[in-house]
Amino acid sequence: MTARLRPELAGLPVYVPGKTVPGAIKLASNETVFGPLPSVRAAIDRATDTVNRYPDNGCVQLKAALARHLGPDFAPEHVAVGCGSVSLCQQLVQVTASVGDEVVFGWRSFELYPPQVRVAGAIPIQVPLTDHTFDLYAMLATVTDRTRLIFVCNPNNPTSTVVGPDALARFVEAVPAHILIAIDEAYVEYIRDGMRPDSLGLVRAHNNVVVLRTFSKAYGLAGLRIGYAIGHPDVITALDKVYVPFTVSSIGQAAAIASLDAADELLARTDTVVAERARVSAELRAAGFTLPPSQANFVWLPLGSRTQDFVEQAADARIVVRPYGTDGVRVTVAAPEENDAFLRFARRWRSDQ
């Protein structure tokens, strides 16, 4: 006889991360190719001296540093810290939704939204994208008296697109004030072309808006798992109530604080990624691919039924990309030489079609 487990888990898949194949070029996980700055490495080294002690469970110094980084309108009580922004997504579901409640988001989007909602016993309302972008009008039309939470993944993972700043502001105004809106900005540092929303302004103006950000992408700390939420103190207090104690390590906290101190230098690196993104996108289009305009550190190839063939042939060429069923492939913008290898493969594959 086996233990009796919750029936909601029976149909849920186990999360499968982007593959790592020794000797292959990994373009599957949207990691930065840049390692930590010397000042961040030094902070990490110093933090190892106290790993025999539990970390600061309240992340007091990190919250204070984040509040300073966000500006004079924010204080530590506006900030929650988690083990990556994905854990904060889970916490948001926990504090808003229970059995029979609804959580709205565009689809396809971050693939952990549906299982996180189902584990809570709530119902995921997956609204089809329009032109690979969140359709905010369609999402608004799905709101009912059972809606508790709305995720807006912006830029959207995996399709790389953003919603317009004005459209997002109008959407927030239109959503009933008792429904929490989570703007998931894991890739916000890569937005250009005047498409970056004033999400912090939305937090200031609306008590039901929370913004999620991470140190995993532009800051290059994916292995240390640090994310944070910005919102009304009541929302932040609720998130802290369901935070699993001590899950943000002392090393991660120290690295994040040092990264904020070096934010200008770290964020300048995103310009290099954006330039490569433009080059990769242009060369893919020249080769005959169709792809939406990217505002992230990856591109989206909507290959449909050809997705699996592309992924398998890429693997044969020692290049690992991220498939999404029969929808398409997400490809990280990496170092120039890695991008060149991918482009050579992509041209060969396209010429064989």
From Swiss-Prot:
HAMAP family hit by this protein: HisC_aminotrans_2, Phe_aminotrans_2
InterPro entries: Aminotrans_II_pyridoxalP_BS, Aminotransferase_I/II_large, ArAT, HisP_aminotrans, HistidinolP_aminotransfase, PyrdxlP-dep_Trfase, PyrdxlP-dep_Trfase_major, PyrdxlP-dep_Trfase_small
Subunit structure: Homodimer.
Stated family: Belongs to the class-II pyridoxal-phosphate-dependent aminotransferase family.
Keywords per UniProt: Aminotransferase, Pyridoxal phosphate, Transferase
PROSITE patterns linked to this entry: AA_TRANSFER_CLASS_2
EC numbers for this chain: 2.6.1.57
GO MF assignments: histidinol-phosphate transaminase activity; L-phenylalanine-2-oxoglutarate transaminase activity; pyridoxal phosphate binding
Top-level enzyme category: transferase
Function: Aminotransferase that catalyzes the conversion of aromatic amino acids and 2-oxoglutarate into corresponding aromatic oxo acids and L-glutamate. Shows excellent activity with phenylalanine, and lower activity with tyrosine and tryptophan. Has no significant activity with histidinol phosphate.
Cofactors: pyridoxal 5'-phosphate
Record remark: domains: The hydrophobic nature of both the substrate binding pocket and the N-terminal lid is responsible for the discrimination of a polar substrate such as histidinol phosphate, while facilitating the binding of Phe and other aromatic residues such as Tyr and Trp.
NCBIfam families attached to this UniProt entry: PRK03321.1 (NF002878)
N6-(pyridoxal phosphate)lysine modifications at: K217
Annotated control of activity: The aminotransferase activity with phenylalanine is not inhibited by 2-(N-morpholino)ethanesulfonic acid (MES).
GO BP field: L-histidine biosynthetic process
Superkingdom, natural source: Bacteria
Gene: pat
Reactions that this protein is recorded to catalyse: an aromatic L-alpha-amino acid + 2-oxoglutarate = an aromatic oxo-acid + L-glutamate; L-phenylalanine + 2-oxoglutarate = 3-phenylpyruvate + L-glutamate
Organism of this sequence: Mycobacterium tuberculosis (strain ATCC 25618 / H37Rv)
Protein's name according to its UniProt entry: Aromatic amino acid aminotransferase
